[in-house]
Structure formats: C-alpha cells, structure tokens
Amino acid sequence: MNVLQKQSIAEMKRVLRNKYFVLWSLIMPIAFYYFFTNVVNTNVPDQRAWEAHYLMSMTVFSVMGSSIMTLGIRMVQERSQGWAAFIRLTPLPDHIYLSAQMIGQSVIHVLSITVIFLFGAIINDIALSPFEWMMSGLWILFGALPFLALGTLIGLMRKVETAAGISNVLYMLLALGGGMWMPFEVMPDMMQSIGQWLPSYHFGSGAWELVRGGSPTWKNILILIAYMMLFMLLSKYIRRKQEAV
C-alpha cells in the first residue's frame, strides 16, 4: 500500500505540472459555463435550473476530458520516452503502476470538481443542499471510471500525435453526443437515438437528475459499468498482444 500511495502522489504532481490539464480541465469548462449562463441569452424558462444543470454538464465535461486526454496522452508520452519500459525493469508491478495513475487522476478530479462547483456557487449563486453537492461530486467521481479506462486504452497507442488527435475527436464527439453543450432534449432525434447509448450521456444524466432532486437510474449505472469493463478488457487484451511482440 505504501508503494501505491507514493506512486499515486507522484502521478498527481505530474498532472498538476501539465499545462494542458489546466487548459482542458479548468479554464475551458469554466469559460464555457460563464459564457452560456451569463453572456448568451438562452431563453430558458427556468434560468436557475439551467445554471445548475449546465454546471453539472461542465463539471462532467472537465472530468471526462481529464480522463481521456490528460491520462491517455501522458501514458503514450511515457511509452515513447521509455519510461514504461523502465518501470517494467523495476520491482513495481504493472497493476500498481496503472492503479496509481488512475488513483492520482481521480484525486485531481476532486480538485477539478471542487474548483468548478465553487465557481458556479460564487458566480451564479447556485443553491444546492450540502447533500446534493456531495452526491453530485461522488457521482461525477464514479462516472469518470469508464473514461479513465478509455484513457488507459488510448495510452496504448504508439505515437503521441495519433493519441492526441484521436482522444481530441473522441472527447468532442462524446461531449456533443452526450448533451454536454446543449440540453439533450433539444438535440435532433437522430442524435438523441445515438446519444442515449453513449457513456457520456449516462454520466451527465446522473448528475442532471441529482440537481433536479432525483437520483441516477440503474440504467445510468449499468451502462457506465458495462463501458468500463469493455474498455478494461480491450486494454488488457491489447497490452498482452503488445508485450508478446
């Protein structure tokens, strides 16, 4: 446990030194949130409900991007620089190394969630109960798991440029299809039909329900778990194939 703890702390420090983390995980979501709740006239019937809804969307957007891009691209960089090969020569087991990366990233998610929640509470005076704040934060931490697994899958790519391009496209498509940038209900029917099976939609849906006084559905939970298992199995299979070469 000591080794896992030390490696997790090391991973957290490395993430915080990454300028892309600050851009994608904090500056962009906060800027989008401010723009669409204070600058653009959205003509929504209930402005207060919209501000709480969109705060959850942008927090999910932040954590999703951090999981897919920050984690995935960093893993490819480590492989290209020989760091992953060096780790295999040390007594540190692979599963400890991967677990430390995911734990470190999850702790960083707590920071992102806290900063964005505070921004929404201060700028728009979002008035959720302590229980709703806590449950929303916990749900977002849970919902990030399949995206962390997707990040480790992207981390198996050979080139940083390829990983950056693919992760960027995936991130934007998942955000758009999952209803992060606009209410899911106003999206075209075809996009809704596709979006309802995306992990990003079920990630956001659970958070939206919580700020409306409800709770995530079992469908939200099961689909996120299914995607997490799928990405983990694919990652394990590809890693074994690569190690066999």
UniProtKB/Swiss-Prot annotation:
Mode of membrane association: Multi-pass membrane protein
The protein, known as: Putative transport permease YvfS
Molecular function (Gene Ontology), one example: ABC-type transporter activity
Similarity comment: Belongs to the ABC-2 integral membrane protein family.
One Pfam family hit: ABC2_membrane_3
Example of a GO cellular component annotation carried by this entry: ATP-binding cassette (ABC) transporter complex
InterPro entries associated with the record: ABC2_TM (IPR013525), ABC2_TM_bact-type (IPR047817), ABC_2_transport (IPR000412), Nod_factor_ABC_transporter (IPR051784)
Superkingdom as given in the UniProt entry: Bacteria
Cystine crosslinks: none
Segments forming a coiled coil: none
Naturally occurring in which organism (per UniProt): Bacillus subtilis (strain 168)
PROSITE patterns found in the cross-reference section: ABC_TM2
Places the protein is found: Cell membrane
Transmembrane segments: 20-40, 53-73, 103-123, 137-157, 164-184, 214-234
Keyword terms: Cell membrane, Membrane, Transmembrane, Transmembrane helix, Transport
Location of the ABC transmembrane type-2 domain: 20-242
